[in-house]
Amino acid sequence: MATFKDACYHYKKLNKLNSLVLKLGANDEWRPAPVTKYKGWCLDCCQYTNLTYCRGCALYHVCQWCSQYNRCFLDEEPHLLRMRTFKDVVTKEDIEGLLTMYETLFPINEKLVNKFINSVKQRKCRNEYLLEWYNHLLMPITLQALTINLEDNVYYIFGYYDCMEHENQTPFQFINLLEKYDKLLLDDRNFHRMSHLPVILQQEYALRYFSKSRFLSKGKKRLSRSDFSDSLMEDRHSPTSLMQVVRNCISIHINDCEWNKACTLIVDARNYISIMNSSYTEHYSVSQRCKLFTKYKFGIVSRLVKPNYIFSSHESCALNVHNCKWCQINNHYKVWEDFRLRKIYNNVMDFIRALVKSNGNVGHCSSQESVYKYIPDLFLICKTEKWNEAVEMLFNYLEPVDINGTEYVLLDYEVNWEVRGLVMQNMDGKVPRILNMNDTKKILSAMIFDWFDTRYMRETPMTTSTTNQLRTLNKRNELIDEYDLELSDVE
């Protein structure tokens, strides 16, 4: 029983403004929609159901019915979902604007209640006040919201969400923003609304209000790769495959500084209708480049590593070894379709082998060495502590020699031309014969930073940017990378 959805259905019949604002895909004729994947709350109609991906941000936050309108909480167009979305910092004045919007769209007074009661009492069997017939009158005004942290912004999507105890498979978490407002003032608003209802309905209204206004906020979730759909890109493993984003916009671009003021637009109904009549869509092609996707890719690579290669004498690079059960890697995995990962894997393994061979370790492919367990971690550059520990364990395994208080290892084994170029690039134009710990870290990190410079990388994909940010980046031609030309981050 989706209270918010029912309220939108009944209240949109009140006037022209409501018919425009409260139009939901969930209340309209169903159209073919993408397959649903996760359980959670649709941000558009607030019902708990199976969710599909949003074409505006690639997150799973819309049901298959509401997906037909392609609404995203990051849109510029001030539709109902966008007007219910606030950014930190939320002030008391912002909340007043939200509550005023609720009162405007979902009023409760004696005249309106009688109108709804008369429309329900069509037959004698409907003389009772059954909750399912009056569900739309039982939506209290609360500061219940779903929250998500994207880059440096925290978003709050206010609404009335039923079934809070159900399983949540999305990155959005429930938060109670009552502490940002006056508890007694909110109580007074709801008691006034409730006073116009029949006694039986008052009891249910009060129960719903207190359960949705006095709950404890839950801890924020960390985003993961699985929270984003692959459906917006042709090939998730190709660096040249872009994510296709659709955003709803209006002719009068609203500054992000005024983000929380969107809900105040409906105060002037004529102006709001005029703004909505100027709505249009903007399409963007954006890069996949972000830390979240990078961590995921390197996580797969680290699980596929064949560390025995660093003791081998194979003439071919690490990914091209055949007929060796200790060194041959399964290169049929989709992750190897990314040429950047192939280059990084081959170069890192070649450099480590050169260090091992240079420092007197006369092993073989079949050797079982203690250092093997640290080799996969050398690709987890986003996990700084783990990566540093792996480099240090490798360096110590090479039995460095102390020279004037600094430990050094040799580098006199042949490396391929690409590795040689990277070493020279990071070591003042020459290939040194000895390396200390910092030199080793510098070279190993440079091999990864050449293609995935995580030091200057967004945490989440650009699909989570606001429409204004996308527009600005597009003007600077910074939405896509030059990987189709095989130009690295450094180049």
Curated annotation (Swiss-Prot):
GO terms for molecular function: metal ion binding; RNA binding. The keyword RNA-binding applies. It is found in: Host cytoplasm, Host cytoskeleton. Residues 82-176 are annotated as: Important for cytoskeleton localization. One of its GO terms (cellular component) is host cytoskeleton. InterPro entries: Rotavirus_NSP1. Residues 320-491 are annotated as: Interaction with host IRF3. Its main location: host cell. A motif (pLxIS motif) lies at residues 485-488. GO terms for biological process: symbiont-mediated suppression of host cytoplasmic pattern recognition receptor signaling pathway via inhibition of IRF3 activity; symbiont-mediated suppression of host cytoplasmic pattern recognition receptor signaling pathway via inhibition of IRF7 activity. Belongs to the rotavirus NSP1 family. This is Non-structural protein 1.
